[in-house]
Design a protein with these regions (language model features):
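N-terminal periplasmic/intermembrane-space "pro-region" immediately following the signal or transit peptide
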Residues: 1-85
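Outer membrane beta-barrel
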Residues: 85-231, 253-257, 338-366
């Protein structure tokens, strides 16, 4: 207090010559008594200034977060269009993923994901099996147990309501456009590729792209995405803006009520060989009846989720795709739809989920000048699964799906695929 008072009095003086002998003696005594403390205080101030300068130069300290998932499944197929008898053999497979997430500024996210899997030869969908994409599982993949980079993504928030995404590896339209499906999760959702989400979001077998997500209000969201195949190659028909397979999508995503989510999407794509490449329907549908020439594809997709009561959710989606050949008058119209009903926490078991999914895989319903015509009949996909929660990190999902008239052909007997999927998350 004495030192503070003295310094204040000193600051009020314009000249040291104005100090009286008594004041000089007081200053000398304070200097002797507090000299050590003043020197220590000076060192501390220097240290604080150094730390402040470091914080100003590095405003955010990046933190790396690691997470992973391993899906182990025992699966088997029965009946169907089995050309060799191999489809009935049970298979024991895995899909393992390891991801890393970090932020460089606090308003962005850098994500890398590595994957290894061993589901060989397209599984039950192979020519030696059911010979149909309708038999594909949602967690199916094959890297021959080699670790591969499956996802590289960078997202940055330009404002509190506007985010842009760039994904040079592992892109699909659903990387930006919300699929609005409660079953779009390979480890915890639907067991089939068809039932997990609408084919519209899988159009083109893309591998690189980006987009934006704009939260216009608390109930309205606008999303846009653009992607291509072979974006890393500079040859003709490849690259980011000259690829022979590209797709653009825009979606208006709405929340009209606290328990309702709905989305309406418009799609515009180019295919150098006329294929849709969604791998969710018949060969005729996915190849546009083997159109085999450049085509412009336009589509409309609608989705809905409605939480009827606390534990019951109804969901649905419908897709219409219109393909027109560029060099001829060939055209094709394909459709697909699905209805889902799920019940959460059955038998008072928190975290469990039982779901029933019924829909039509992608089908050619009309066309002009198509080499192999339209799909004559209609397949129906019926799926039932029960996700059993063992802990926060482990779940077991027994499930089965049946496809009537596989490949939309009434001459083919129904195919059945069953699985017991165990998912570990860490």
């Amino acid at each position: 207090a004495a030192l503070d008072g003295c310094l204040q009095a000193w600051g009020e003086r314009r000249s040291l010559a104005d100090l009286s002998p008594e004041e000089w003696q007081t200053l000398e005594r304070l200097q002797r008594d507090f000299g050590g403390e003043l020197e220590d205080l000076g060192d501390r101030v220097v240290g604080l200034e150094r730390q402040i300068a470091q914080l100003e130069a590095q405003e955010f300290s990046p933190t790396l977060v690691m997470g992973g998932e391993s899906i182990i499944a025992l699966s088997a197929g029965f009946a169907g269009n089995d050309n060799s008898g191999d489809a009935t053999n049970p298979v024991f497979t895995h899909l393992s993923r390891l991801g890393f997430v970090s932020s460089l500024t606090g308003r962005d996210r850098l994500r890398l994901e590595f994957q290894a899997s061993n589901f060989a030869n397209r599984g039950f969908a192979s020519p030696s099996g059911f010979n149909s994409d309708m038999a594909l599982l949602s967690f199916q993949g094959n890297t021959d147990n080699q670790i591969q980079l499956s996802r590289l993504e960078y997202r940055v928030a330009l404002s509190d309501r506007f985010v842009i995404t760039a994904r040079p590896v592992g892109f699909s339209l659903s990387s930006v456009l919300t699929a609005n499906s409660p079953y779009f999760d390979a480890g915890r959702g639907a067991i089939s590729r068809f039932a997990e989400a609408s084919p519209a979001f899988k159009l083109g077998r893309l591998d690189a792209g980006g987009g934006f997500d704009w939260l216009i209000s608390d109930t309205v969201r606008l999303q846009g995405a653009y992607g291509v195949r072979n974006a890393n190659r500079s040859q003709e028909g490849q690259g980011l803006f000259n690829s022979d397979h590209s797709a653009f999508g825009v979606q208006l995503f709405l929340k009209p009520a606290p328990t309702v989510l709905t989305g309406i999407s418009y799609l515009n794509a180019y295919s150098g060989n006329g294929r849709l490449d969604t791998f969710t329907g018949s060969f005729l549908a996915d190849t546009n009846s083997f159109m085999n020439e450049p085509a412009r594809i336009q589509g409309v997709n609608a989705t809905l989720q409605w939480r009827v009561v606390d534990n019951v959710t109804f969901s649905t989606w419908g897709t219409w795709l219109f393909s027109d050949a560029i060099d001829s008058d060939r055209s094709a119209t394909t459709t697909s739809y699905l209805f889902g009903l799920s019940y959460a926490d059955p038998f008072q078991r928190e975290g469990d989920l039982v779901a029933l999914l019924v829909g039509q895989p992608l089908r050619v319903v009309s066309g002009t000048g198509l080499p192999f015509g339209e799909d004559e009949d209609t397949s129906l996909h019926i799926e039932l699964f029960y996700r059993l929660r063992l802990s926060d990190r482990i779940s077991i999902t027994p499930g089965v799906f049946v496809v009537t008239n596989p490949e939309h052909n009434a001459d083919n007997p129904a195919l059945v695929v069953g699985t017991i999927r165990t998912t570990f998350r860490f």
